[in-house]
């Protein structure tokens, strides 16, 4: 299987998000990379499902809560920007204050 660098990045984020989901199910608080991966994966998959940029900007801030993250993680993440493929092309989705 020959994957482009972009496809490898997407696969890595998806795998990290899967690990984060498992940890949340066990009650383990997320660290910085896990929180970023989980929100990023939500945005990429939402774009594939046909959701709009505006919907994903709003919903991306509701994926995880402050209580689901280690102390200080919410303050470390001011914005998350994800390049996602929508039915009409690739767009940049920005989520401001993604962990509330």
UniProtKB/Swiss-Prot annotation:
Heterotrimer of UreA (gamma), UreB (beta) and UreC (alpha) subunits. Three heterotrimers associate to form the active enzyme. Disulfide bonds: none annotated. The gene is ureA. It catalyses: urea + 2 H2O + H(+) = hydrogencarbonate + 2 NH4(+). Pfam families: Urease_gamma (PF00547). Pathway: Nitrogen metabolism; urea degradation; CO(2) and NH(3) from urea (urease route): step 1/1. CDD domains: Urease_gamma. GO terms for molecular function: nickel cation binding; urease activity. One of its GO terms (cellular component) is cytoplasm. Belongs to the urease gamma subunit family. It is found in: Cytoplasm. One of its GO terms (biological process) is urea catabolic process. Its EC number is 3.5.1.5. This is Urease subunit gamma. Keywords: Cytoplasm, Hydrolase. It comes from Rhodopseudomonas palustris (strain HaA2). Its main location: cytoplasm.
């Amino acid at each position: 299987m020959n994957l482009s660098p972009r496809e490898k990045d997407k696969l890595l984020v998806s795998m990290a998000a899967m690990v984060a989901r498992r940890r949340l199910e066990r009650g383990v608080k997320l660290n910085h990379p896990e929180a970023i991966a989980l929100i990023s994966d939500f945005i990429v998959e939402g774009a594939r499902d046909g959701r709009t940029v505006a919907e994903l900007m709003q919903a991306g801030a509701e994926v995880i809560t402050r209580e689901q993250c280690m102390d200080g993680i919410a303050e470390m993440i001011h914005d998350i920007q994800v390049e996602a493929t929508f039915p009409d092309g690739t767009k940049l989705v920005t989520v401001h204050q993604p962990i509330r």
